[in-house]
């Protein structure tokens, strides 16, 4: 297989290598014969190589010979008609067909001429193949059809031609995705229009994740597609019904609004609210103003939560988004109805947008929420205060969670000035000093002592049986991570 050539469309290199292993090229000596009848011989391979290079003079010369075989193939299965479809040569597709070329031939990867023409938007070639009777429902290894490929590429005329030829509108590839999903995710509104007019299934959802074409469009920020689907009657407040959560699957109850927010498509999110989306919907476990905290400052770990923060699309900054959402009815003090303290994690139930902003020591967001009317003293259902959250209560991944030492110190100062008690104890027997120890931030320990935290209030065991000293010496969820500087800071703080 010629890996120095452009690899076959739609096939990632990993797949190509895998298939190369599954279908090894046969090597034969000059005195041997191959059992593959149509495999091009050394003597006749020249014209087929010309077709690969889009030079059809050699093909024309070869066609004059009585021995010409229009279905000769290269080791990977590529034939002249496949190259004609790839290079958008409809006249050669017609000539080769007249010479006996199989229009439904496929490579070892089950790539047909029509799928090639559809994927590359080669309209004249695709229409020629359809007119000559090519199978419009051919499938690649992943069961991708020409309609899906054309929908993703965006040529609405090819999509229309395939529909008129009787293609199955709602055929599904191996992951359960349809042509409408591919068009919606790619933002090809013209293809979406044609598919909708033809009567495709708008409500089809993937079995595990519950994703629909509507949700794909929201996740990818495809505003034009969103508007077309709304005009078609999609419910702006519909949510996914997840059968198998975790990993890369979304949370159950995610709406298009939440997909847009968490993917960084903030202009689209505002547009959805203006079109009727509920700015206080928390069926996914969180509301838009809660989610903006991790859109601005990513979570932790080598997992989906630890992915880089999304790139904000459009011209709407995250803080301007918050302001507009509040103007459109978002409750700045909305308290979460779901959640629990899993292990040592912070309990989100009862948390407000300000509470989550404090958790990440996001000073700018905290200041804006205060300006918009946030109550800085609202605790979660465990009575964990914003001060405790900023200090580090709930931190399990040292050095990976949002908030630098400098940011945390500023947040602690702000929160105490706003009325948060540095000596408060929550229902899990946690204090702000326990949080500072969990972060391994000696600066936060000293700052809390400076702000009035006294050892009589914090030098005790939490629900897990750990004092701040125990935590600083390494007792914490996961691996042991002692911090001698934090231990020293706690010793200093205990003598205040």
PLM regions and their residue ranges:
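Bacterial N-terminal signal peptides
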Residues: 13-24
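Ankyrin-repeat-protein effector appendages
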Residues: 32-47, 198, 232, 275, ...
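Start-of-repeat signature of ankyrin repeats
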Residues: 43, 77, 110, 143, ...
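Ankyrin repeat A-helix N-terminal signature
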Residues: 49-54, 83-89, 116-122, 149-155, ...
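Conserved ankyrin/ankyrin-like repeat signature
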Residues: 58, 91-92, 124-125, 157-158, ...
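Ankyrin repeat domain, specifically the short helix-to-loop turn at the C-terminus of the second helix
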Residues: 63-68, 94-102, 127-135, 160-168, ...
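Ankyrin-repeat junction/capping positions
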Residues: 71, 104, 137, 170, ...
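Ankyrin repeat boundary/linker residues
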Residues: 74, 107, 140, 173, ...
């Amino acid at each position: 297989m010629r890996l120095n050539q452009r690899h076959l469309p739609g096939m990632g290199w990993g797949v190509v290598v895998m298939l190369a292993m599954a279908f090894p090229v046969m090597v034969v000596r000059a005195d041997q014969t191959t059992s593959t009848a149509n495999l091009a011989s050394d003597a006749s391979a020249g014209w087929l190589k010309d077709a690969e290079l889009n030079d059809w003079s050699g093909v024309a010369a070869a066609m004059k010979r009585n021995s010409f075989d229009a279905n000769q193939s290269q080791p990977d299965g590529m034939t002249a008609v496949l190259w004609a479809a790839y290079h958008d040569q409809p006249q050669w597709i017609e000539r080769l067909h007249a010479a006996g070329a199989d229009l439904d031939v496929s490579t070892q990867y089950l790539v047909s001429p029509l799928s090639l023409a559809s994927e590359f938007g080669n309209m004249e070639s695709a229409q020629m193949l359809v007119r000559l009777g090519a199978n419009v429902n051919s499938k690649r290894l992943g069961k991708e059809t020409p309609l899906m490929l054309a929908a993703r590429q965006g040529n609405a005329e090819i999509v229309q031609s395939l529909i008129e030829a009787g293609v199955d509108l709602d055929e599904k590839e191996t992951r359960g995705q349809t042509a409408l999903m591919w068009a919606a995710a790619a933002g090809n509104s013209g293809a979406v229009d044609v598919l909708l007019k033809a009567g495709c299934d708008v409500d089809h959802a993937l079995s595990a994740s519950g994703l629909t074409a509507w949700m794909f469009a929201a996740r990818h920020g495809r505003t034009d597609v969103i508007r077309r689907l709304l005009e078609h009657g999609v419910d702006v407040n519909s949510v996914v019904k997840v059968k198998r959560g975790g990993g890369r699957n979304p949370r159950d109850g995610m709406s298009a609004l939440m997909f847009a927010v968490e993917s960084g498509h903030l202009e689209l999110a505002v547009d959805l609210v203006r079109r009727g989306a509920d700015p206080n919907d928390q069926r996914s476990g969180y509301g838009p103003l809660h989610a903006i905290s991790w859109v601005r400052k990513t979570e932790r770990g080598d997992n989906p939560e630890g992915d880089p923060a999304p790139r904000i699309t459009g011209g709407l900054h995250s803080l301007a988004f918050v302001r507009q959402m509040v103007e459109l009815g978002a409750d700045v003090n909305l308290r979460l109805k779901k959640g629990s303290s899993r292990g040592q994690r912070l309990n989100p139930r009862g948390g407000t947008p300000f509470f989550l902003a404090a958790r990440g020591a996001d000073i700018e967001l905290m200041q804006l929420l205060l300006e918009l009317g946030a109550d800085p003293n609202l605790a979660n259902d465990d009575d964990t205060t914003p001060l405790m959250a900023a200090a580090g209560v709930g931190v399990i991944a040292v050095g990976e969670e949002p908030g630098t030492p400098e940011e945390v110190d500023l947040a602690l100062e702000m929160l105490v000035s706003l009325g948060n008690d540095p000596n408060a104890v929550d229902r899990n027997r946690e204090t702000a000093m326990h949080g500072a120890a969990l972060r391994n931030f000696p600066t936060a320990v000293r700052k809390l002592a400076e702000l009035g935290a006294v050892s009589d209030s914090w030098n005790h065991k939490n629900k897990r049986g750990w004092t701040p000293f125990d935590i600083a010496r390494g007792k914490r969820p996961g691996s042991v991570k002692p911090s001698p500087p934090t231990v020293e800071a706690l010793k200093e703080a205990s003598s205040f």
